[in-house]
């Protein structure tokens, strides 16, 4: 009964207005009130503040500052094997596995279209058809910065407007095409492991999605698809990120989806739906690598 109520609220509540209100409030400096809200959040969600660079909740001027708190450098060691890719975020695996043609598994009884997820981009869809995917859900208590699974050269970013349904196991099991319907930021990289996409998916109360190269991508929510492109690594204006380096962040919640081309990586056998993830641990192992020189000179 409670689950039905939660799902019903997802359909009838003014999600955009709630999200904008939450984003506004989370960015305000409230002094003692801000500290009280942060303390209540830490208590309710059992957030481990010992991992944070600033464990004292009084040191955060806004709730957003707390939510995107950086961790101590040693809190998340990054796997150094050059043939292994690493998990991009703390959280839990929602689903992972092969992309069956154009279909990605969402939950029992639900798949969604790769092309729909990629906003109808046929060229990008062809890169990842029959490849591999990993969907990672970030719970409220988790660290909400997102990092690189491997070295990468940014080539394309697409902002896709959409719904702002809550993203959690309940909605994944009951709302068809959830990840292809919600607002999202698609980032495509050239890597030694072939093309890779990392998608930051919005949700109700996700005040903003940011990247390290562009700052805040959303809001504003203008309702139109936006696309940016970047040159190869040896050209002026290139964006090159290293394995384990931060690439983006959520100011409140949501989900990261990774896409890999066919025949390039083997996902870690230890990872299954529901597995807890820690940034920097092994995500996948190379099956086929390109030379760094070839990656640097991709057209």
Curated annotation (Swiss-Prot):
UniProt keywords, alphabetically: Cell membrane, Decarboxylase, Lipid biosynthesis, Lipid metabolism, Lyase, Membrane, Phospholipid biosynthesis, Phospholipid metabolism, Pyruvate, Zymogen
Protein's GO biological process: phosphatidylethanolamine biosynthetic process
PTM: Is synthesized initially as an inactive proenzyme. Formation of the active enzyme involves a self-maturation process in which the active site pyruvoyl group is generated from an internal serine residue via an autocatalytic post-translational modification. Two non-identical subunits are generated from the proenzyme in this reaction, and the pyruvate is formed at the N-terminus of the alpha chain, which is derived from the carboxyl end of the proenzyme.
Cofactor binding remark: Binds 1 pyruvoyl group covalently per subunit.
Reactions accelerated catalytically: a 1,2-diacyl-sn-glycero-3-phospho-L-serine + H(+) = a 1,2-diacyl-sn-glycero-3-phosphoethanolamine + CO2
Membrane topology: Peripheral membrane protein
UniProt-annotated catalytic positions: 90, 147, 254
Enzyme Commission identifier(s): 4.1.1.65
GO molecular function: phosphatidylserine decarboxylase activity
Highest taxon of the lineage: Bacteria
Localization: Cell membrane
Modified residues (Pyruvic acid (Ser)): 254
GO CC annotation: plasma membrane
InterPro entries: PS_Dcarbxylase, PSD-B, PSD_type1_pro
Cofactor(s) recorded in Swiss-Prot or TrEMBL: pyruvate
UniProt keyword Cell division, yes or no: no
Pfam families hit by this protein: PS_Dcarbxylase
Role according to the record: Catalyzes the formation of phosphatidylethanolamine (PtdEtn) from phosphatidylserine (PtdSer).
Subunit structure: Heterodimer of a large membrane-associated beta subunit and a small pyruvoyl-containing alpha subunit.
Protein family membership: Belongs to the phosphatidylserine decarboxylase family. PSD-B subfamily. Prokaryotic type I sub-subfamily.
The name this protein goes by in its record: Phosphatidylserine decarboxylase proenzyme
Organism whose genome encodes this protein: Erwinia tasmaniensis (strain DSM 17950 / CFBP 7177 / CIP 109463 / NCPPB 4357 / Et1/99)
Gene name of the record: psd
């Amino acid at each position: 009964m409670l689950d039905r109520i939660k799902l019903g609220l997802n359909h009838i509540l003014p999600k955009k207005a709630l999200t904008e209100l939450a984003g506004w409030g989370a960015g305000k400096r409230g002094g003692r009130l801000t500290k009280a809200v942060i303390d209540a959040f830490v208590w309710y969600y059992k957030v481990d503040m010992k991992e944070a660079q600033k464990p004292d909740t009084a040191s955060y001027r806004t709730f957003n500052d707390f939510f995107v708190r950086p961790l101590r450098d040693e809190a998340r060691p990054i796997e150094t094997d050059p043939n292994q890719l690493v998990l991009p975020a703390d959280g839990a695996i929602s689903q992972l596995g092969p992309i069956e043609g154009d279909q990605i598994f969402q939950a029992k009884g639900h798949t969604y279209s790769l092309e729909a997820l990629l906003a109808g981009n046929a060229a990008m869809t062809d890169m990842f058809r029959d490849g591999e995917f990993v969907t990672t859900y970030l719970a409220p208590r988790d660290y909400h910065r997102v990092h690189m699974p491997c070295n990468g050269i940014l080539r394309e970013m697409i902002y896709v407007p959409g719904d702002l349904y809550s993203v959690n196991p309940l909605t994944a099991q009951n709302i068809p095409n959830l990840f292809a319907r919600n607002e999202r930021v698609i980032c495509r990289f050239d890597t030694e492991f072939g093309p890779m996409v990392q998608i930051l998916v919005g949700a109700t109360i996700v005040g903003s999605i940011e990247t390290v190269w562009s700052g805040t991508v959303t809001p504003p929510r203008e309702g139109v698809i936006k696309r940016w492109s970047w040159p190869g690594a040896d050209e002026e204006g290139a964006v090159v990120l290293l394995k384990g380096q931060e690439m983006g962040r959520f100011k409140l919640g949501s989900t990261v989806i990774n896409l890999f081309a066919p025949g390039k990586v083997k996902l870690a056998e230890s990872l299954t739906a529901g597995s807890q993830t820690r940034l920097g641990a092994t995500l996948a192992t190379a099956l086929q690598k390109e030379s760094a020189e070839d990656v640097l000179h991709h057209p």
